[in-house]
């Protein structure tokens, strides 16, 4: 295995040698979506003739573990049928529990089998044009006390880019987990931690990010990798937002534009801030360009959301689309799902039940009963009303998010879930095929 330091040196040297033949953006709202034959093609946010909307899927649970996506990996630790005691809650503790070599063996088997070339062929055949691939900082570098398996994920990421290229798909690479965690979610790799902006952790995260930017912003990747997300879901309400901007986001932008002189597109998550919050940051007023704002939209992570009726859910979804129209940045809905419940096992984390059926309790937030989670993963036992509502909800979201740049649904496949699995939703005619097909048209008009 070539060392991270050596790979970084090679990537930087190569970037300096490559003539990227950049094309200046047409306007501050421009989006580089297609890069063909060394010529960038832009779509304009305010144009009625947008060349192509992003219609993508997330490859969640692959290079970053998530218990609810692949529960079998975590069930292997179960010793008690009555509770989840002893089951690792995230990838950090998964590796910590097994030790490096055994964790590497199990992870390598997972990486080798969960997504294969045929999945990319199928994704393309179903009309999608984009895959967003989450990866953790630990794929590229680790801290001395980290238990993570490192240096192996890049091989699979590169294979994914090759497969995407072969089948005409574009790729967003998404830094999904920061050192010390940027949100305390299990999908960051380390649950219940918020140390990302501490000096040691920030340095490690930036080291991984600059490597990703250096490698995947060169001409040999720009035909396929058309965006790099600086960080998934930094929890803005927990962090000092000015520090997040000035210590991480702006330095990353400056590194890409001024250090390695790349025109690669940057994707910036909204950090759970309201619409228009980011209008004055990297917005094009100072010759900045190529920054996309990523909004994530779910309606299942609070009792209030879960209690909404379908008309309310659809109204909220359509409002999300309208809300982006006044923003200065081009925007994409980088995550959303078909979920109408939080019933999927471990969706709320190992050790927690569902708010929907009243089995979830965390801190002072005691859930209450809304409905039953029985047969949630058996679509054959769903009522016709639930099937219809799921299709209506999906279609409304697709229409809402195509008001601007498009969407990337979370996620393409899971082991057991229906609500979070595009592949299964298509199989059961709950997700439109072709994507433009509508059983419930004009919901957002």
Curated annotation (Swiss-Prot):
The keyword Lipid metabolism does not apply. The keyword NADP does not apply. It comes from the Eukaryota. It is found in: Secreted. Gene3D superfamilies: Glycosidases. Residues 1-20 form the signal peptide. This is Sporulation-specific glucan 1,3-beta-glucosidase.
